[in-house]
Amino acid sequence: MFRKKKSRVLQRDVNFGNCLEDMNLQITNDFYLRKLNAPNELYEFQVTKDKEYNEKFYFAVLDHVYSWTLQNSLLTRISIPLESSPSEPHSWIYATRNWQTNENGIVIIIQSMSHPLIWSNRNLREGDVRRATVLDVIAKCTEKKLSVVIFSPSALLWDQSINFPRTTRYFTSQGLQITKKSIIKDVETPESYVSIGLNYVMSNSVSTKIHFVGSEYGSYLLNSYLDLNWKKFSGKAGAILLIMNMSINEELHDPDYVSYLIEHARNYLPSHEPCRHLMNSIMTESGIPNFSAGKYIDEFYDYIGDVLLEMIALDTNTSKS
């Protein structure tokens, strides 16, 4: 007679402290994530042979880096749906504090389905934390007196135990059940989250120039929204930076928007060519110029702030001429 093997239930009471130091980690003075007692050593997610513990450790690190980024970037969080109470299911968009009143320009960033405010987990482990997160982009934009609004379409599930929006991967890794109480009303999908958030931002910003960044799946969300609303916002549009653009010509219905993309957008794709080089031999179906993002997409995130400002400068000079 066979006995049913007991399945281990994930314990939710693992406490990793309130900061990276409690996990024997630190962000060094030169902005690298390293071990607290060995600042020259990379941190490791695989800290034990216990896979479940490692998953908890992994997300605890991401949460602490998220909090560090939020604090150092001075971003404010805007609840989506709007005016939700802290205990009601909601997600967030993130904005620099003068985004409504700044007339100089605004940059709207739609992230991929990565952890909120973090571009690349690989870069987080190996590179400058400011560039692995959105902090470097924000610093470069605000230095040019541009406001920034960031969308994180991955965190659309509500963890009612701590009243916090989470990613699907987080729920899976922690053994959490997705129930009706996990669903955030009105923003059940990334599309609805982006649509509600962008409608709010576009209606409340006084800026006459809006620049856009769409990263990976975020490029699809951005294109879908602008294609549908192009006649309303075309007069304010500036540079459009796409990373691994996922939209094809058949999905874009406004010919004026397609024409604008061809003239004003860039799409960055992984390739063996040097990072940031124009790939003349390859064009997307919509005709957007493709540039090399380097061998791995993570490589490009180190340069995203520089590329964005370069595109904004070109757009500004074109507008003046």
Swiss-Prot record:
- Example of a GO biological process term: regulatory ncRNA-mediated heterochromatin formation
List the Pfam families hit by this protein, alphabetically: Arb2 (PF22749)
| InterPro entries, sorted | Arb2 (IPR048263), Arb2_dom (IPR053858)
GO cellular component term of the entry, any: ARC complex
Question: What are the alphabetically sorted keywords of the record?
Answer: Cytoplasm, Nucleus, RNA-mediated gene silencing
Q: Could you tell me where this protein is found in the cell? A: Nucleus; Cytoplasm
Function field:
A member of the argonaute siRNA chaperone (ARC) complex which is required for histone H3K9 methylation, heterochromatin assembly and siRNA generation. The ARC complex contains mostly double-stranded siRNA. Inhibits the release of the siRNA passenger strand from ago1 together with arb1.
Q: How does it assemble?
A: Component of the argonaute siRNA chaperone (ARC) complex composed of ago1, arb1 and arb2.
**Name of the protein described by the UniProt record:** Argonaute-binding protein 2
